[in-house]
């Protein structure tokens, strides 16, 4: 806990004579200044819409050049024109009288470049310059400890650049408490009231026994460098935004590893990541954006856990839209691995997820356009009011539903660990599967829609529930299959076939329970095997649909010793128990412990002896709305 003392020592009172954080106005300076920098602008919304409403600011097109200026990425400096500060124990010397020194506190008031070297046992570097000043601090093998405040405090400036000199190793730390020195609530090792950029080819270690690692009350930009941060609270915190172009990060925190939040402006408080390598271990969220969260690329290893049941422990979290365009993610969380309180779009990326709650969850619309998603253990795999899969390879092992479309939200989290999500039957809830390869191993419903279920392409394989209280397929409204491959095996008590609006043949049969590992096969009347697949679980019913099933033809289904022949008088054979049975997406209530999944991925990929023409996933348009099932003519061979 941060201990902010109100009693000032005589030393600090003296320092305040030089470091009072005034609202400085523009004035001419004599020191060498930085290059002219263009103004950074926030991203704007393109106005694209999706089913479901949200008041959150949700930009859909972002230009990376709007996120970073040329100066943000510039790591060079002219040493001959720079002011040199030498730190030594409890004293500081400067090559210029433009720096005010009081004991172990140096105050910089003039625009320019300052090179710091050496070590301070207990001191501060303060920037208190004009509100137009751009100041560069070069850390060249610097160690600064501040027992009662920030090691670096930006009180006033237009923008400050902290550059890690090439090959340098730098350490900044706080001693475990913060003493108030002005009206600002300083609570981090690096604390900035102004825009702050970090870059360079060196290393920065930050140890915050209390408070946060790095805080900017405006924009926090990191363009390059290596950062090892251990903080009692947040690791990186930006009020207006966190923007990361590149870098290597190892962050261990008592709260969120990355945290951005601006309660006064819904267009701010966002996190944008263009790339980098991230190893995040948090007792809160891995990343928490009060606005939107957009990841272009990068490598992410995220672990969250805590004994505090009231704390959110998600991997990636956004109050606004969450978009992933690429990257490699290994996420192990107690709460949702990837979560948006609004809409979410996954355009690409490789995900390996273990979670005690949902794998990928959106309170509104979830769209998967591509990527490789493996959810080894979860409560529910994919969840949103509307779930749309246009392409990709998805493997889900769930203790409840594999894919769930339902109204409501779970902003408080912990559907699996602490009880069901706050969902109810919703006519707006829909699942659209238009392409890709989906393997589901679910203890609850394999695919569960509180509204409608539409399959237009792709391949879907479900090792469904062994309990008769759930079904491999469950929907409350209507369903249809117009393309693709579907094999869904599970218990027979709640078994459902696809609906009468289907334009391709679909068969539901029930039989005596077959052992796990028993192969299901479909053959035509000439004995040609059309498709075969092996379930990882016991089952007593199966739904099979492929483009090869046509009206008027006869087919043989085998499952272990069971064999039956069916004649397709219509495109739908066997309706099951009716329209949905128990309401789909009923909030689960499985409520059990964190799942101990076996990593099973919903059976083995089927062995097909024909070319399955008509099975290539559709070439979807790029507007990412994903909300209306297309009129499919193409083939659907998967990814």
Q: What are these regions, as identified by a protein language model?
A:
Residues 2-639:
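A composition-driven surface/loop motif
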């Amino acid at each position: 806990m941060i201990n902010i003392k109100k009693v000032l020592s005589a030393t600090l009172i003296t320092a305040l004579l030089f470091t009072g954080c005034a609202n400085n106005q523009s004035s001419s300076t004599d020191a060498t200044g930085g290059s002219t920098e263009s103004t950074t602008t926030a991203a704007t919304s393109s106005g694209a819409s999706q089913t479901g409403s949200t008041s959150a600011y949700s930009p859909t097109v972002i230009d990376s050049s709007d996120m970073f200026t040329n100066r943000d990425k510039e790591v060079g400096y002219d040493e001959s024109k720079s002011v040199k500060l030498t730190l030594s124990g409890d004293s500081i010397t400067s090559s210029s009288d433009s720096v005010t020194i009081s004991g172990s506190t140096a105050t910089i008031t003039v625009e320019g470049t300052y090179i710091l070297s050496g070590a301070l046992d207990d001191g501060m570097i303060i920037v208190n310059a004009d509100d137009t000043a751009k100041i560069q601090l070069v850390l060249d093998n610097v160690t600064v400890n501040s027992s009662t405040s920030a090691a670096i405090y930006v009180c006033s400036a237009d923008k400050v650049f902290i550059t890690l000199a090439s090959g340098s190793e730098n350490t900044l730390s706080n001693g475990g408490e913060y003493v108030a020195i002005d009206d600002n609530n300083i609570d981090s090792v690096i604390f900035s009231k102004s825009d702050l950029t970090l870059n360079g080819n060196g290393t920065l270690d930050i140890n915050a026994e209390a408070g946060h690692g790095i805080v900017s009350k405006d924009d926090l930009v990191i363009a390059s460098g290596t950062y090892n941060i251990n903080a009692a609270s947040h690791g990186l915190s930006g009020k207006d935004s966190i923007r990361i172009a590149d870098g290597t990060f190892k962050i261990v925190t008592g709260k969120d590893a990355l945290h951005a939040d601006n309660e006064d402006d819904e267009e701010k408080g966002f996190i944008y990541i263009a790339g980098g390598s991230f190893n995040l271990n948090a007792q809160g969220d891995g990343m928490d954006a009060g606005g939107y969260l957009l990841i272009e690329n990068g490598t992410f290893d995220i672990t969250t856990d805590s004994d505090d049941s009231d704390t959110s422990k998600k991997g990636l979290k956004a109050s606004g839209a969450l978009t992933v365009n690429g990257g490699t993610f290994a996420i192990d969380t107690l709460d949702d691995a990837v979560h948006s309180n609004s809409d979410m779009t996954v355009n690409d990326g490789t995900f390996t997820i273990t979670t005690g709650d949902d794998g990928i969850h959106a309170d509104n619309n979830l769209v998967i356009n591509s990527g490789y998603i493996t959810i080894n253990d979860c409560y529910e795999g994919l969840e949103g009011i509307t779930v749309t899969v246009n392409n990709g390879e998805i493997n889900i092992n769930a203790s409840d539903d594999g894919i769930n479309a339902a109204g409501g939200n779970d902003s408080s989290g912990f559907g699996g660990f602490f009880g069901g999500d706050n969902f109810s039957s919703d006519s707006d809830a829909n699942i659209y599967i238009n392409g890709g390869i989906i393997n589901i191993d679910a203890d609850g419903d394999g695919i569960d829609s509180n509204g409608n279920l539409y399959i237009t392409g792709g391949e879907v394989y479900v090792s469904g529930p062994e309990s008769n209280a759930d079904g491999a397929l469950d929907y409350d409204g209507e369903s249809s299959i117009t393309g693709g491959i579907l094999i869904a095996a599970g218990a027979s008590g709640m078994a459902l076939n696809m609906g009468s609006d289907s334009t391709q043949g679909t068969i539901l049969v029930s039989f005596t329970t077959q052992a796990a590992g028993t192969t299901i096969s479909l053959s035509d009347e000439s004995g040609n095997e059309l498709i075969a697949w092996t379930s990882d679980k016991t089952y007593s019913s199966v739904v099979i649909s492929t483009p090869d099933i046509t009206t008027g033809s006869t087919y043989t289904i085998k499952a272990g010793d069971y064999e039956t022949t069916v004649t397709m008088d219509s495109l739908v054979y066997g309706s099951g128990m009716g329209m949905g049975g128990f309401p789909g997406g009923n909030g689960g209530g499985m409520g059990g412990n964190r799942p101990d999944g076996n990593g099973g991925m919903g059976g083995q990929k089927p062995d097909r002896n024909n070319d399955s023409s008509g099975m290539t996933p559709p070439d979807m348009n790029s507007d990412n709305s994903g909300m209306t099932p297309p009129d499919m003519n193409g083939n659907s061979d998967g990814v």
